[in-house]
Amino acid sequence: MNERITGAEALIKSLIAEGVDLVFGYPGGAIIPVYDKLYDYTDQLKHILVRHEQGATHAAQGYARVTGRPGVVIVTSGPAATNVITGLSDALMDSTPLVVITGQVASSFLGSDAFQETDVVGITQPITKWAYQIRRAEDIPWAVARAFYIANTGRPGPVVLDIAKDAQNGLLEWSHQKCTYIRSYIPYPKINDEDLKAAADIINSAKRPMILSGHGVMISGAEKELAAFAEKADIPVAATLLGLSTMPSDHRLYKGMLGMHGNIGPNINTNRSDVIIAIGMRFDDRVTGDTSKYAPQAKIVHIDIDSSEFDKNIKTDATIHGDAREVLEKLLPLINPADHSEWLKTFDECAKVEREKVIEREVFRTEGTMTMGEVAHKVSKATGDKAVLVTDVGQNQMFSSRYFRYTDPKSILTSGGLGTMGFGLPASIGAKMGAPERTVCFFTGDGGLQMTIQELGTIMEYGTDVKIILLNNNFLGNVRQWQELFFNSRFSQTPMVNPDFVAIANAYGIAAENVETREQLDDAIARMLNHKGAYMLNVNIDPTDMIFPMTPAGAAVDDIMLNANEKYQIN
């Protein structure tokens, strides 16, 4: 007979059996038994004490994105459980595997409005792959195994285990077996040969094809397969925001980012192409613009692990249901070698206009206050284009993702679908802990930073070496831009009165400096990157700086603003 242990200890042992060595969390009354047993396993399971439960979920997301393994969160009941809601929703939208464990009142108190009782399962079911309440200690091992299997297979996402306090204190004979099968859950479908052939026939007939590379390529680890596929058929590749770094920025076939603030070539040529091959992306509104005017001339081939995305936003001509890497491996032999050099030249022509009309004015300005684009460009260059870029949300997100260059996969972490301000600081902590050998550069604005600024305390406690670039324009810049362009410059509640960010960083033991002029910028970046430990640059940014190109919300994808007064002229 195996030794009987408590449910709390069974949880810890089950996490370790699943390969977990790092968790993010915050203790409280309904989860105290777990934290008590954690005390005995600190040599096997490191716990990161965040400063807010939302920060735990975003840190776990950062960790999961760079490692490909589920991020784990442990929090108590009530307000702690409701504080993880934003992170769960963000993880579901961006297909990030999380296992979030919440404490719960004892089973006998459920439904009585006990102290710090909330209906965690009811609240989280719409924003998770699986939410389950555990009321018996003996259910903990199998539930943990199932949670990890669901979170990290198929289209990844978050799961929640809500563990009643009596289940934590109850006794069981512990053993753990990893889950490899759940009836009615088929995470990796068998790829249909007829679907492959139908897609190949369309692709082989193309004269002006485009590949749209999404987050699914990164999740699948299909970067090499993507390159081989594109090279054989000589097809240009554009990436969604979350698909950035799935192809190196300097690859001859890589043509830039799609979307509202993407590069001109990919957006314009979406409506010039005759075949679009979408891989691991979901045609969300920030990519398509007005769906009634999206690529009406093109045949669309959609490859995705989640069949619910097919025909949801854009009507397709062929679909392949499967993992991106496996699909590309099977599709490659069916694709004919091709030469699309004339088609590729049209992207270069668009890039020339973009450089003259947008990039030169943004990145290579010599007068006036600094711009976000020039800061991002210089930081990327100073890292040899090898850093992991973590962004917050807003103008800082768009500028940094546009002007960073990517050499290696998994080099960008950002909140794409939900657009969560405050995501970046805790996510950068998780990213650095998951990839300690890589430089992590976190770009943020003065608005987003202050939403989770308390996580500077986590950086202080654990000595996390995150480079923080605060693009400080004393405005909620993205909203300000919309107000200037579309609401007659009525700047309602967007100017900000800010604290002394350098003093705040210093109070947390973090080296920091103000950067007031572009003459100071290069040396400040060098000091930041050479410093051993966290470092913050508080960079004075032109508040009138706006992110272009821009496809206005609801406009056609090729209706592109070059600046506030000029649109791209389609030939």
Which residue stretches match the model-derived regions?
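Phosphate/pyrophosphate-binding active-site segments
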Residues: M1, E138, S175-H176, Q297-V393, ...
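Active-site diphosphate/adenylate-binding microenvironment
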Residues: A8-I12, I16, V20-D21, G29, ...
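Thiamine diphosphate
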Residues: I101, F115-Q116, M260, D311-N313, ...
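A general structural motif
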Residues: H52-E53, S112-A114, I186-A200, L258-G262, ...
